[in-house]
Design a protein with these regions (language model features):
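Beta1-alpha1 glycine-rich phosphate/pyrophosphate-binding loop at the start
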Residues: 457-467, 475, 504, 508, ...
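Iron-sulfur cluster-binding cysteine motifs and their immediate structural context
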Residues: 447-468, 489-519, 564, 571, ...
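FAD-site-proximal beta/loop scaffold in flavoenzymes
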Residues: 642-664, 744-816
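Glycine/Thr-rich beta-alpha phosphate-binding loop at enzyme active sites
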Residues: 21-37, 250-346, 381-399, 642
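A conserved FAD-binding loop/helix module that cradles the flavin
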Residues: 812-837
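C-terminal helical cap(s) of enzyme catalytic domains, especially alpha/beta-barrels
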Residues: 88-104, 379-403
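Glycine-rich phosphate-binding active-site loops on the catalytic face of alpha/beta enzymes
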Residues: 75-85, 246, 363-390
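Glycine-rich dinucleotide-binding loop and its adjacent helix/turn
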Residues: 518-534, 592-613, 634-686, 787-798, ...
Length: 997
């Protein structure tokens, strides 16, 4: 495929807007912002009914980007930068993909990739389209939005004829061909409008802009910056912003801010800080420009800030340097604003861009900093729809005139940013949220949470029922696949939440909370009604009453099998009941999970240890045996002197002795997994303990514990000692070698090297939490084949061991893991025993309107045990790739007779930025892998995408699938083309012909 975009002619642009709006959307946006009965503000002598809009960048390059922004609520548009290098010459210099915005954003793009005259035409088309949309769709005052041009990068280039002409024609476009064309089309097609009149069209002003933002390259001398701004003020009579760089802060300050906020991994040197404009030169220059503009009755200010150049270290983008933006830039940008506000006493106008979004936009504007433009937040799921929420939020202060920038408010924002979870980097690296599957050509909607769950729970279904207050029904849905709703509702590691699409908004849906609400709210009603599904003439013994054993008992007993569960402990529940502290999960709720299995008829024989499987099986006439013995073999911590207390032994003692274990005052926990966090938190609660230290050979970022577990330990006062490796415990001290981080290893973690430095930590008791192993001797004694790690050799499809009829599940089968994995193991074994599939997939049963109503809205979950209603029901509508495409090149269509929307890629609108690849839940890049509509058949030659192009107006098309081309006629029932793909081609031709330009 080619990265050269084809602009949409104005007649086709307007036709699409009008026809698609009748279908309920505009450029894929199913809702809009309407500025009703608002008193607008003023900026540069013109009305402005909103202080926000898209920044110069991927969201202001094409007419459709501008239209989508306006429809969403943008009212100030900083158009993509124009400079002397343009078109194919510039595109050849931009490495693709050029954007990655999963968390903070990085890009390696520059100015417009269009030719300058094309860019001008796009801006004029966008201008006209927004004007008539405002009137036709009641979006607001047609004269209350503003365009602002961005030009660069040197005075010589700005004075070149093509850029000079661009500036002049943006100032007054009435004599240009594109302006005349747009106006003529509107006048000739007034019959297609309900509200737009001839007078409205005639009133569209040709003075598109009266302001400019100066953009210069890094290293541009202050004299050149001043010369450019002076020229635009004096010669072009434009209100002017000069874009400033975060490098004004100085290297040490910028490095310290980023390190403090968790961005210590972002690499950069002091080169740009020395090479860029220096603050000591900036202030006098800006004061001179401010006075110059004032003398000509023009406004002057700064644009804070440009993106921040950093090094490519982990193949983030195919370039050597990339430009950082988004949340990691906020504190840097606002710190520049603070310095300038202080030194100008608030009189210097600031246009802001640098990590603005819904969570901070109100405070930014209240501080007197506006207009505010943005890019990163628009590149995430929800896309342009995110403008709606922000525009509504700002309505109440819209009319407040600008007086000055309030220094105290700016300082408060900076201070708060250092601990704002929306701005700081999480302690742990982001999990991989992508599936290992490739995106299919059709039916690609998917539910990442269910896909990631080992038992594929119907999360959206029970979540919906919980929010409807139908707890009994919700629990019934859960129990279909999950026999341990209380255990998983309390302490599941919820990998489902890590994959949740809402992570790209703010915080994952609290799936585990919804489950616990259903369990607690539905248990009493559900329990008496649990009846066996039938009678299966089988008898099965289960060894072990932990999560895997209870799960096996539940599944088998429900099916009608006679099940007997044996365990050496007096209390069923395994490690969960006998080891995990009570502050993690109430004991009575563990037993409720046991009761569910008992209600189906499972019989528990506690305090009875089984050592001989063959005898056990014969004595009880068991048709099958499920071994679920857990992983309890210690992984000892070897010290030169002293001994360590085993983590599981301590937790069991802590529970049995009611938190009164003799530990002394100072406790050191060695390890960094979830169990280590439990140990540390339990030790903090233990009688007599004053200090708890957690020692690990790497840093918090590389600790295996889940983010949630880590944060809870930090909040409870556990003292984390990073980069330490213990070697001796004596005289109430633990001696550790200081470790030094080295390069990233194959696991994705940075390797460590031991230094000569020795660190002493006060220590009365050392508790080792460095993992548990499976005791392979149990299997060997029973004639079961094991691996070199002591794990049983199992059949992948059934978890059956080398002994026929004997199955293994849980930690004892695969090593220490999590509860939901134990359930999955047990389920697989039970399916083999029963010879049937357990559980039924249930759709979310929601509506398009409900889902689209949530898209674009950033909302944190309620605190406490409250239902989380923010689910986007991705099994019904995903469309992430459509949301995040700035150019709207991924599009959802409704195929007649097909329930779910289908996604096609539109080649002529794509510049291969790669943003959709980041947010697609599959291990795929939609712009390369979805069925693609090409502008012309010859453009298929520049691409390897499967797709189609129409060759005439009669429905004849060329289609390529799997590299093979064929001719296809719309409606042909005898075609060899797969019917689902034929439906896509037919639907585009019949119902979405506005996509054909």
């Amino acid at each position: 495929m080619s990265d050269i975009m084809t602009p949409i002619p104005f007649d086709r642009l307007m036709n699409r807007i009008l026809v698609e709006h009748q279908q309920g959307a505009v450029f894929g946006m199913q809702k809009c912002y309407q500025a009703k009965n608002l008193q607008p503000n003023t900026l540069f002598g013109r009305k402005l009914e909103g202080q926000i809009g898209p920044a110069a960048g991927p969201n202001t390059q094409l007419a459709q980007n501008i239209v989508a922004s306006y429809y969403g609520g943008a009212r100030f548009f900083e158009l993509k930068t124009v400079q002397k290098m343009d078109g194919r010459e510039l595109a050849a210099c931009v490495a693709k993909p050029c954007i990655t915005a999963e968390d903070e954003c990085y890009n390696c793009e520059w100015s417009t990739e269009l030719e300058v005259p094309q860019a001008f035409a796009e801006y004029v088309k966008g201008w006209f389209a927004c004007k008539v949309m405002a009137k036709e769709y009641d979006l607001g005052d047609p004269d209350a939005f503003q365009f602002n041009i961005s030009v660069g990068y040197d005075l010589e280039g700005i004075k070149l004829p093509k850029v000079d002409r661009f500036i002049n024609e943006m100032k007054d476009a009435k004599d240009t061909e594109i302006f005349k064309e747009c106006k003529a089309w509107l006048l000739a097609n007034l019959d297609r409008f309900q509200k737009v009149t001839k007078e409205d069209v005639e009133a569209i002003q040709s003075e598109i802009i009266n302001s400019v933002t100066v953009s210069t390259l890094h290293g541009c001398p202050p004299s050149e910056i001043e010369a450019i701004a002076s020229y635009l003020i004096q010669e072009k009579h434009l209100h002017t912003f000069v874009k400033c760089n975060p490098t004004l802060l100085g290297y040490e300050t910028a490095r310290a801010i980023l390190d403090e906020m968790g961005y210590d991994y972002i690499a950069f040197t002091d080169f740009h800080f020395k090479d860029d404009l220096q603050y000591s030169d900036a202030v006098p220059m800006l004061k001179r420009l401010q006075e110059l503009a004032k003398s000509l009755n023009l406004a002057f200010g700064v644009k804070i800030t440009n993106t921040f150049p950093v090094d490519v270290k982990n193949n983030e983008l195919p370039s050597q340097e990339m430009y950082m933006s988004g949340k990691s830039l906020f504190a840097l940008s606002m710190s520049v604003a603070k310095m300038l506000t202080r030194d100008f006493n608030g009189s210097l106008r600031i246009s802001f861009s640098g990590g603005a979004d819904y969570f901070n936009i109100e405070r930014i504007v209240e501080a007197g900093i506006w207009p505010v433009t943005m890019a990163t937040t628009l590149l995430k799921t929800g896309g342009y729809l995110r403008f709606i929420q922000m525009a509504e939020l700002l309505e109440k202060n819209l009319a407040k005139p600008w007086e000055k920038v309030e220094l105290s408010l700016v300082e408060k924002m900076i201070a708060d940013a250092k601990s704002d979870k929306h701005l700081v980097k999480p302690v742990k690296p982001l999990p991989n949220r992508k599936s290992d599957k490739k995106v299919p050509l059709v039916d690609c909607y998917t539910m990442p949470c269910r896909d990631r769950c080992p038992i594929h729970q119907d999360i959206t279904s029970y979540g919906r029922l919980v929010n409807e207050g139908k707890f009994q029904e919700a629990l019934e849905v859960i129990l279909d696949k999950n026999p341990l709703p209380f255990m998983t509702g309390n302490i599941c590691t919820h990998t489902c939440q890590s994959a949740c699409t809402r992570n790209h908004y703010e915080t994952d849906v609290q799936i585990r909370t919804n489950k616990l609400i259903a369990a607690r709210g539905g248990y009493d009603a559900v329990l008496p009604g649990l009846k066996q599904e039938g009678s299966v003439q089988k008898k099965v013994g289960v060894i072990g009453a932990g999560p895997a054993g209870i799960s096996a008992a539940f599944f088998l007993a429900r099916a009608g099998v006679e099940v007997h569960v044996y365990d050496k402990d007096a209390v069923a529940g395994g490690v969960v009941a006998n080891v995990i502290p009570g502050f993690r999960i109430p004991a009575e709720e563990i037993q409720k999970d046991v009761n569910l299995a008992k209600q189906y008829g499972a019989q528990f024989h506690l305090g009875q240890e089984v050592s001989d499987i063959d005898a056990f099986r014969k004595e009880n006439n068991f048709d099958a045996v499920v071994v679920a013995i857990g992983a309890h073999k210690e992984a000892p911590l070897v010290l030169e002197k002293g001994e360590a207390y085993n983590a599981l032994h301590f937790l069991a003692d802590f529970k049995a002795q009611d938190g009164k274990v003799n530990l002394g005052k100072n406790v050191v926990v060695v390890g960094a997994g979830n169990t280590a966090m439990d140990v540390a938190r339990a030790a903090k609660r233990n009688a007599g303990v004053e200090n708890v230290y957690l020692v690990y050979r790497r840093t918090k970022r590389y600790m295996p514990a889940d983010q949630e577990e880590l944060e809870e330990a930090i909040e409870e006062g556990v003292n984390f000692q990073e980069l330490l490796a213990p070697f001796t415990h004596e005289n109430s001290k633990l001696l550790c070698h200081r470790m030094v981080l080295s390069d990233v290893d194959a696991s994705g973690r940075r390797s460590v090297k031991e230094s000569d430095e020795v660190v002493e930590i006060p220590c009365d008791t050392v508790i080792a939490s460095i993992g548990e192993k499976v005791d392979g001797s149990f299997y060997e004694k029973n004639g079961i084949a094991v691996t070199d790690k002591g794990l049983p050799v199992l059949k992948k499809e059934s978890n059956e061991t080398s002994v026929a009829g004997v199955y293994a599940a849980g930690d004892g089968a695969f090593g220490a893991s999590v509860i939901v994995k134990a359930i999955a193991d047990a389920k697989l074994a039970c399916e083999a025993i029963l010879n049937k599939t357990i559980g039924t997939d249930r759709p979310s049963q929601t509506t398009d309107e409900k889902i689209y109503g949530k898209k674009g809205n950033l909302v944190e979950p309620e605190k406490g045990l409250n239902p989380d209603k923010r689910c986007l029901a991705c099994d019904h509508i995903c469309e992430n790739c459509c949301d995040v495409c700035p150019n709207r090149a991924n599009f959802a269509i409704k195929v007649p007779g097909v329930e779910m929307h289908q996604i096609i890629h539109v080649d002529y609108m794509c510049n291969e930025c790669g943003n959709c690849e980041t947010f697609c839940p599959y291990d795929s890049a939609p712009y390369k892998e979805k069925f693609t509509l090409f502008h012309r058949a010859e453009e298929m030659e520049d691409s390897t995408n499967d797709g189609f192009a129409f060759v005439d107006n009669d429905g004849n098309a060329i289609v390529r699938v799997g590299g093979e081309k064929m001719n296809y006629k719309v409606g042909d029932k005898n075609t060899k083309l797969f019917y689902r793909l034929a439906e896509l081609v037919d639907t585009v031709y019949n119902d979405y012909s506005y996509l054909l330009i």
